[in-house]
């Protein structure tokens, strides 16, 4: 698999209902014939009625996920979604790997209108990623 030139990464939150986040991204990647890998930025407890709880993933674990994948399954492209507290970490990782294209799909609010990104994180997103 490490020689597969069609690897897409999703860096996003996990949606326990399967309707969004890394679960949905991986399904889309597969539908387009890509091998998908994921770096989880947040865990959510949610269903079709809304988000009940969000648990951001520590930056050290985000780095560990990146390190685990980068030398074995390097991405052709990265798609980012819900970043929670990981905006600055992702900006640093992308800056250290400038040849990897990144599609930024920032998730600012859930469909049930729960805020998913602070103003400070949004400012960093605008300055360093978008």
Specify the residue positions occupied by each region the protein language model found.
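Small-residue (G/A/S/T)-rich helix-start motifs and N-terminal tracts that mark the onset
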Residues: 1-77
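Conserved beta-alpha-beta core of the PfkB/ribokinase-like small-molecule kinase fold
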Residues: 77-80, 84-130
């Amino acid at each position: 698999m490490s020689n597969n030139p069609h690897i897409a990464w999703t860096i996003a939150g996990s949606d326990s209902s399967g309707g969004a986040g890394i679960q949905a991204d991986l399904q889309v990647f597969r539908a387009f014939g890509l091998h998908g890998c994921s770096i989880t930025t947040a865990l959510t407890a949610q269903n079709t009625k809304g988000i009940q709880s969000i648990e951001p993933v520590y930056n050290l674990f985000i780095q560990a996920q990146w390190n685990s994948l980068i030398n074995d399954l390097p991405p052709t492209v990265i798609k980012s979604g819900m970043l929670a507290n990981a905006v600055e970490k992702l900006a640093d990782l992308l800056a250290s790997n400038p040849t990897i294209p990144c599609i930024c799909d920032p998730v600012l609010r859930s469909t049930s209108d729960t805020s998913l990104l602070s103003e400070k994180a949004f400012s960093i997103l605008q300055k360093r990623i978008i």
